[in-house]
Amino acid sequence: MAGDSASLSLSPIKSDKAAVVSESPVKMKPGSSSSKVIDTLHTTIDSLSLEIATLKQTNQELSRKSQVATAKNDSFVDQLANLKHENDMLSALLKRKERRILDLEDQNSELSNSVESLNMLTKQMKMRCEKLSDSSMQSMAEYERLKISYDALVASCNEYKQHYKTELDTLQKSLDTYKQENHKQWETLNELISSNDKDIDTLLDSLNNKKKLMDNIYVNKNTKVLTMLSTLATLVKAHGTESKNVLGDNAQTIEFLLEKYPDLEEKILEKEQIEIDINSILYASKDALENTSFDEEDVTLINSPELEPSSDGNFPAQQLQKRNNVGNQQTSNSNNSNNSNSNSSSNSNSNSNSNNGSSNHAQNKRKGKRTPLSGNSPSVHMPSMWSNNSSSSSTSHTPFNSQNQNNHHHNSHHQQQLHARSNNTNKSYGNLSHDLQHGHLPKKHAAINNITNTYSRSSGGGGGGHNSGNNNGPNAASNSNNNNNRRRSGYYKKAVSSQT
């Protein structure tokens, strides 16, 4: 504003000066012109000084106004800041109030829900109270009814009590009477027992004497059994030696026949329609002869056990023990070969076993708690030739059929009869060895009969060298059975002929 006023005041001065300058070179003279210029300059200076003073005053006023405006502006700025701060405070307060309002609304909704639930609970409690009041009325009525029933039961119980009390008094009197009578009977029986003590002692003495007599009988029986077993072992050894010799003779006979008739197998196949492997038979026979020996092992008999009673009058639990040195494999082979023997030997063995079972049952009844004799029989250590003989007799079969009568020479018939005799004796002794190994001791007469019959067959069976033509006698029957067994054993097969 001050600049605008100064520009307005200087504008006429400049215009006058321009007019003087424009006029001076043309019309003025040099002397008058300098004075006029000086006057003009003085005038201009005065006007300028006046204008400067005016401008100073104006400037001072404007400065004062500016200071006042600045102070007002500062106060306005302070007021604006205060108002802004107050506005922020009010906004925060408003937000807190709004949050408080929301919290109060939530509390209000929760309280309204709780009020509704309390109202429902109050209604339910009222209904329950009504039901309880009804049930209380029913309970009171039931109580009155039960009270009446209880009074009736108490009255009946009192009556029963009185009745049973009378009955108990009667029973007590009867019991006292029974005790007195029983006491009298007990005294009578006690007197009788005391009078019978002497008779009991006498009976016990006689029983002990009989028991000692039975012990002596059992000792004698076991001694006889051991003697019989020793005899049997000797016979078995003799028979084994004889069977070995017969087997060697048969092997030599077959070798002689092979040397004399090299085509013997073809002839047998042609005549008998039987396929046979003579080399395998010879090999099995030689193997049996080499592996069988009767000189290495001896017969060992175990003495009879002590049967004297102990201090308390009882016999020891282990009276007889069974000891067998024959291998498990040899025993199984011997049993398998013995099971395929003839029916006559199995029948005799079954009879002896049944007699043995009845004898053992009777002995057990006499002994009381004593162990049976068949379970703990005295063991006999027999030579291993039983299993070897049985296996050799089952493997080294002769290929000839005993029922064919006209197609073979004297040597073949003689070999067949020798083999049948050896097979019969092997079957009998094999069955006896099976019974001995499993603890079955037959009765005395049965064992003696078996030994006698077997020995007579083994010694007298060779007389029928040409008996193959008839089926009579034990040798022919056993030959037929042995041939059937040999057909089943697989050593030779029946050839399939074209005219079957």
UniProtKB/Swiss-Prot annotation:
Any single GO CC term annotated in Swiss-Prot or TrEMBL for this entry: endoplasmic reticulum membrane
Annotated Low complexity bias: 332-360, 381-406, 468-484
Record localization: Endoplasmic reticulum membrane
Biased composition (Polar residues): 1-12, 418-431
Keywords annotated in UniProt: Coiled coil, Endoplasmic reticulum, Membrane, mRNA transport, RNA-binding, Transport
Biological process per Gene Ontology, one example term: endoplasmic reticulum inheritance
Sample GO molecular function, one term: RNA binding
Membrane topology: Peripheral membrane protein
Region (Disordered): 1-35, 324-437, 453-500
Coiled-coil intervals, chain numbering: 41-185
Taxonomic superkingdom: Eukaryota
Keyword Cell membrane: no
Cited InterPro entries: She3
Family listed: Belongs to the SHE3 family.
Free-text function comment from the UniProt entry: RNA-binding protein that binds specific mRNAs including the ASH1 mRNA, coding for a repressor of the HO endonuclease. Part of the mRNA localization machinery that restricts accumulation of certain proteins to the bud and in the daughter cell. Required for the delivery of cortical endoplasmic reticulum into the emerging bud.
Entry protein name: SWI5-dependent HO expression protein 3
Protein encoded by which gene: SHE3
